[in-house]
Amino acid sequence: MKKFLPLMMAMVFALMSCAPKNPAQVSALLDRIGGEGTSERIETQVKTALSEDGKDVFEISSKDGKPFIQGSSLSALTTGIGWYLNHYAHVNLSWNNLTTDLSGVEFPVPEVTERRECSADYRYYLNYCTYSYSMAFRTQERWEQQIDWMALHGINLPLAAVGMDVVCKNVLP
């Protein structure tokens, strides 16, 4: 039992460190779309306890005079960021323009907490035609912007048809 207690304590501390405030990838996303320093002006946190039934949930509130966005997963959190930018800050980020200078934008601080729950487990994106008429011509930078756009819109199931031909060959008669 004496050997078991330190092991348990180490596991508890390891698990506590797995719920980061301002996750690095979310901070990087904010700085990519809004310019350097945007991540310091919006507080974010992944909080799995927000979801009671496994659905993606985000909440928008305020903390220390800043917007505070929490999500039950990284996908929910980035969706919440997209919702906040669109519906609170009135910033429209589109496919063709996913970056803007937000240094001069004063982010509104919500007075009440807004909670949104996604009704769909899977948010599908793309179609088979996209592989031929647009994806083939994208650069690495354009791919990164597309992934950021998907994150801001809650996409968690982009079409990945690469290798599908092998599955069809092995499964279909």
Report each predicted region and the residues it spans.
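Auxiliary, metal-adjacent structural segments of Zn-dependent hydrolase domains
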Residues: D31-D53
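Short, surface-exposed beta-strand/loop micro-motifs that present aromatic residues
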Residues: D56-S62
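Short, linear, compositionally biased motifs with a strong N-terminal bias
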Residues: A10-M11, P173
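Bacterial Sec-dependent signal peptides at the C-terminal "C-region" and cleavage site
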Residues: F13-A24
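Sec-dependent signal peptide recognition
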Residues: K2-A10
